[in-house]
Amino acid sequence: MKVLVVEPEKEPYVKEINSGLSSLQKEVGGFNEAVYPFEDPVAIICNEEGKLEGLPLNRALRDEDGHVYDIIAGTFLIAGLSEDNFCSLDDTQIEKFSAMYKNPELFMRFGSRTLVIPAEERAMPDKERKSMDMER
């Protein structure tokens, strides 16, 4: 089946995998958990114990207002849903979720709050950095 693989600090990519449990566990590095945060017929398949195992934080899950309600730790997959199982994503789904998770995210903890920063903002060309320093 054709899935989207989303690794920490990387852009998503499409991969063909077997639909069996062992293939899914291999991809996410442990026991898997499926979550269904979208209206689309897709699932996020992630490592059930990713946070407990200290896997790197990957991407935030947001509600319809854009507020973060959870963060996925470790590599996760996005797979299509059939009536009773996971299935291949179609091209429209691949395009939509590739764009949604294109930019890796960084996470910073401040007290009880966690800030989510798109990784693209982290890397600033030297010319821009010098320009900002001169403005101070």
Spans of model-derived segments:
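N-terminal nucleophile
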Residues: 1-15, 19-125
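Non-Sec secretion/translocation targeting segments of pathogen effectors
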Residues: 126-136
